Amino acid sequence: MATEGKKLTTILSIDGGGVRGIIPATILAFLESELQKLDGKEARIADYFDFIAGTSTGGLVTAMLSSPDPDDPSNRPFSAGKILQFYFAESPNIFPQKPKQPRQIDEMSRLEHAVNQFVQSMGSIPEDEYGRERLRFMFPDCRSLIDLVVRLWKFVFDPKFNGEKLKEVVEEKVGDRRLSETLTNVIIPSFDIKLLQTVVFSTLKAARDDLEDAPLQDVCLSTSAAPYYLPLHKFEINSVNRSRNFNMVDGGVAANNPTLLALSEVAKEMSLDGKAQCLDNMDCSKFLVLSLGTGSSKRNNKLEIVNENWGPLRWLWGDNGIPFLDVLMNAIDAMVDIYLSAFFRGASFEDNYLRIQTDSLNDSEIGMDNSNLENLQNLENIGNELLEKPVSAMNLETGLLKPIRGAGTNRAAIIKLAKRLSEERKRRLAQSST
């Protein structure tokens, strides 16, 4: 068992949030730099965490952190700094601000041609210059109307982005590696819409069962198949005389903050007799958990009821996101944070759980697909500013983050965490050499 003989079980958890993954990536880059100060330039995040859990964009980060960097001749895992660069390089391609829509252009041309044929069949093509000029003015308006109809059709029936660039990037970063081949244990949730059930992709499960051993590419595309934004993902695993079909949507609909899910999965792995398969029976002194959020806009009152009669369109169409998903994911995230804070504090081991999150994003920053360079830079700045803010926990009465008295800054907490991770790794290396 992967956790046997260890003084601490170390867990890293990364929320979903699209381009807002820059925020946790920035914090991870700082953590890795501190680890490198202690253990050398070759230190990588994957060397220090027994389990890395991630949802959606956090799942992509998880997969990269636990995969060899194809540009590294020594096959070391991706560095956190390189993952931060990945967001700046690829976000504009995955989430283009003005996505090309060749199907829309073809459809408009076809419809315009049909209108032209109809006019000809009616024998009303103007022969005089004045009539032809009127027709020339009519077609731009017609094209505008067609454009509106086609855009509305695509909004209702198609994802906002075609996902082709995401597939290319995932293939480039993780190659043909399978889930059982990650460099540390990963836990990546998704949701099967056919079974209406959360699917947890796990390295340890994959090592035991071929039907759990999905290609890492499919895992990434499953956990990041955000409703409305990207296509769903369907794939199949075949084994000897067995097969399994997956019909997947973004893991954020079930566990946008995967920390609690990760602890639950670890509890199952650590249980030999079934007695410890719930958190109540776990000794939290044996866990060291870092949970990284991608930000929320709670303080900016993003949603407000002006008209009480919200139909399907109001729930699905907001200025900077999907109100239904925003409410669902924020509610789940809040409950996970509240439960885990109480769990570790109640056992007087609050230093074993560090959650870094902001609830002050504005309307521009909260968009998961806002790949504008200025916004990406703002998100990186937010990550750096978070390091200087005090360690915080959610206030149960207000639902807002409140500084924990005497806990210091997130920077100081990360530096302290780096030392504990380094000491734990050195202890294990010394133990394995004797």
Feature names for model-found ranges:
Residues 1-434:
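Conserved catalytic cores and adjacent C-terminal regulatory segments
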